[in-house]
């Protein structure tokens, strides 16, 4: 039975309310999609961005100085990453060749400046808050990258799988180059 025949059969079914019939037809119309599903979680910084234009202020004590006259113009930005990325879209869209980010790993560590515990009782899907956090930043990062631009993302095993799927969705899996694995710390003697 093809989709059209199934559609006609649903229309002819007895004992269904119009609402039930509409629901079944709606399910039939939905296209299958592979990908991540998560609940969008708003952040306080998003409210500020709606009301205020983010402004970057130069701190000469943190200037990156080069002895070369033809040196590229490098910028180190310190501050809320979503605000900084949003500010850069006004001046650097499509102009950045390399982005390196070291986002929270969602490990629950309380010693970080940023929230590193994105799973809570309100999180219907275990990784929703973290994925929502990363999605917003990576979509802006994509806007900033030049055609030859690359992004390096430091992450641990806790969110690596989710990050890979999210990056495939945003940047296309065809643009993925490689995972670079490095040993964070030496294991104690006798570790197997």
Where are these regions (language model features)?
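DnaQ-like (DEDDh/DEDDy) 3′-5′ exonuclease domain used for proofreading
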Residues: 1-100, 108-127, 136
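Conserved Class I SAM-dependent methyltransferase catalytic core
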Residues: 127-181
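Short, glycine/acidic-enriched loop or turn micro-motifs at the edges of active sites
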Residues: 83, 105, 159
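Hydrophobic alpha-helical scaffolding
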Residues: 75, 153-157, 191
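Class I S-adenosyl-L-methionine
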Residues: 177-192
